[in-house]
Amino acid sequence: MAPSSSPLRTTSETDEKYANVKWEELGFALTPIDYMYVAKCRQGESFTQGKIVPYGDISISPCSPILNYGQGLFEGLKAYRTEDDRIRIFRPDQNALRMQTGAERLCMTPPTLEQFVEAVKQTVLANKKWVPPPGKGTLYIRPLLLGSGATLGVAPAPEYTFLIYASPVGDYHKVSSGLNLKVDHKYHRAHSGGTGGVKSCTNYSPVVKSLLEAKSAGFSDVLFLDAATGRNIEELTACNIFIVKGNIVSTPPTSGTILPGVTRKSISELAHDIGYQVEERDVSVDELLEAEEVFCTGTAVVVKAVETVTFHDKKVKYRTGEAALSTKLHSMLTNIQMGVVEDKKGWMVDIDPCQG
């Protein structure tokens, strides 16, 4: 899938290495970039070659299943600029596979793994001046799969749109020490047999009420419990969770109600590499409150320590800082992503910034 020629030529011919952005002030907010990727296909067919087009609004039928019934998926991944000016993407194949799993659950037509990865590379290459300088942030990449064709009843869309846009970002959480979490015993994020295990667009707006209530009370984020028993922890609004006690690192299993995070998978492997016993199992609230350390993982948040957890009227403080495992794992992961150490895992996909 070759990129359309004129937009990429426009980008490569500019004399600017970087966009006009105050990189030191980046937060996790949208900064519109130059180009996006768009491809379409009919139900039962395959995606044809997509195009790099100017970033902007899209036209969509008011009868589309994405608008009426929430038939849509999204992914999130990042591109990094190294000190030797390489641009790298972290494990895009894993996002492609997760989108395919979600598409099967929502009866959608996904791009192939190769189409997905190539489209991500094209999008990054077209917007390479928006990849922040080393240590100043990352380019957050958001692939979307939308049921965009018109249909009135509840049914698979007759047409699908695969779209990728991006934005330079800084830290997701600005707190320097650790997160202060509220365990929500009122609302639930997912239930058995639902869509909690795929990155459906419908999973996220229902958590906003809980998140706003928590933030208004001074918390950083919300930790949800399982809907079946209300006794086991599941995940935050947009990231996975781990607890540490002794040499054992535990995280809830991805058995249908928890998103199988790419960062979660990577951190589990790194923790195992340095001698920790990693367990995927049900983790009760009682175990959470007795843990020595708690941290969360995700594309946006990377690896972030949890400083406190509040459940009802009980507040527990955890180990953070240089002595914390999360600090070591964060360093191990970001050193791979930024090219500080050799990528022996084969996780990174390099893009030549001189192409285009």
Curated annotation (Swiss-Prot):
GO biological process: glucosinolate biosynthetic process from homomethionine; isoleucine biosynthetic process; L-leucine biosynthetic process; L-methionine salvage; L-valine biosynthetic process
Cofactor(s) needed for function: pyridoxal 5'-phosphate
Function according to Swiss-Prot or TrEMBL: Converts 2-oxo acids to branched-chain amino acids. Acts on leucine, isoleucine and valine.
Pathway: Amino-acid biosynthesis; L-isoleucine biosynthesis; L-isoleucine from 2-oxobutanoate: step 4/4; Amino-acid biosynthesis; L-leucine biosynthesis; L-leucine from 3-methyl-2-oxobutanoate: step 4/4; Amino-acid biosynthesis; L-valine biosynthesis; L-valine from pyruvate: step 4/4
Sequence positions bearing N6-(pyridoxal phosphate)lysine: 199
Record keywords: Amino-acid biosynthesis, Aminotransferase, Branched-chain amino acid biosynthesis, Cytoplasm, Pyridoxal phosphate, Transferase
EC supergroup of this enzyme: transferase
Natural source organism: Arabidopsis thaliana (Mouse-ear cress)
Chief place where the protein resides: cytoplasm
Protein name: Branched-chain-amino-acid aminotransferase 6
A Gene Ontology cellular-component term: cytosol
Reaction catalysed by this enzyme: L-leucine + 2-oxoglutarate = 4-methyl-2-oxopentanoate + L-glutamate; L-isoleucine + 2-oxoglutarate = (S)-3-methyl-2-oxopentanoate + L-glutamate; L-valine + 2-oxoglutarate = 3-methyl-2-oxobutanoate + L-glutamate
Subcellular location: Cytoplasm
One example GO MF annotation: L-isoleucine-2-oxoglutarate transaminase activity
